[in-house]
């Protein structure tokens, strides 16, 4: 899962002792095999409710997604269980986003996953962090065709478009996609990419003047600059 491991390193330190989150994660994972829906939901809901969401996001939700993905990869849980956990994590992030005020001013940011990419937890996390900082966010989610992305950017004229790449593409597919982004999206918006795949394809992105974000700390720095620029134009 893209950016998830890096997110923990770049996130603010949580106020709870790390062992508390580690113990909770072990308890949550223990409910997945054998699968116990009631205990899983009670523990997850209870934990997220009692800490600030930023701490819950980086101390519980992102590590949980990362570890569940690894369990599925190692054939310790079924893909249906992995999807179940992922949907709960998505719901938590969407719920937190919906409690934030709708920005009428500030930098405009489009967040999406490229064509064929269905894993959107990291992209959703990016959208949340943009919302927290007062950006006007257009979150498009998974598997967005380049033509559709370009069409939207042409209409809303964003200050920045961020794409989430969890995995590197083959050389041919990467070249085709990056050229399409440069030709169709870049004329309407500055482009940035993040994730393990983006970092692996760094040279190709740099060749086409597309910014590669190393982690969430670098994202936050870029967003702060955008918001200052937006304020100065107001």
Predicted regions and their residues:
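C-terminal regulatory/effector modules of DNA-binding transcriptional regulators
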Residues: 75-234
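Long amphipathic alpha-helical segments
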Residues: 1-101
């Amino acid at each position: 899962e893209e950016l998830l491991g890096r997110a923990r390193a770049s996130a603010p330190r949580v106020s709870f002792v790390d062992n508390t989150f580690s113990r909770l994660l072990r308890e949550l994972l223990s409910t997945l095999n054998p699968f116990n829906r009631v205990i899983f939901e009670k523990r997850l809901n209870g934990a997220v409710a009692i800490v600030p969401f930023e701490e819950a996001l980086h101390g519980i939700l992102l590590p949980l997604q990362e570890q569940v993905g690894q369990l599925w990869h190692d054939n310790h849980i079924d893909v249906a269980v992995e999807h179940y956990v992922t949907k709960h994590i998505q719901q938590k992030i969407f719920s937190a986003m919906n409690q934030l005020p709708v920005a009428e001013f500030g930098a405009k940011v489009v967040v999406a996953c490229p064509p064929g990419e269905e894993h959107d937890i990291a992209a959703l996390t990016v959208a949340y962090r943009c919302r927290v900082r007062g950006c006007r966010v257009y979150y498009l989610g998974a598997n967005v065709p380049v033509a559709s992305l370009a069409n939207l950017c042409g209409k809303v004229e964003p200050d920045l478009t961020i794409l989430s790449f969890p995995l590197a593409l083959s050389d041919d597919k990467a070249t085709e996609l990056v050229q399409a982004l440069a030709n169709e999206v870049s004329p309407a918006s500055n482009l940035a990419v993040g994730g393990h795949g983006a970092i692996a394809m760094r040279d190709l992105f740099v060749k086409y003047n597309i910014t590669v974000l190393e982690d969430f700390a670098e994202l936050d720095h870029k967003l702060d600059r955008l918001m200052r620029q937006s304020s100065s134009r107001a």
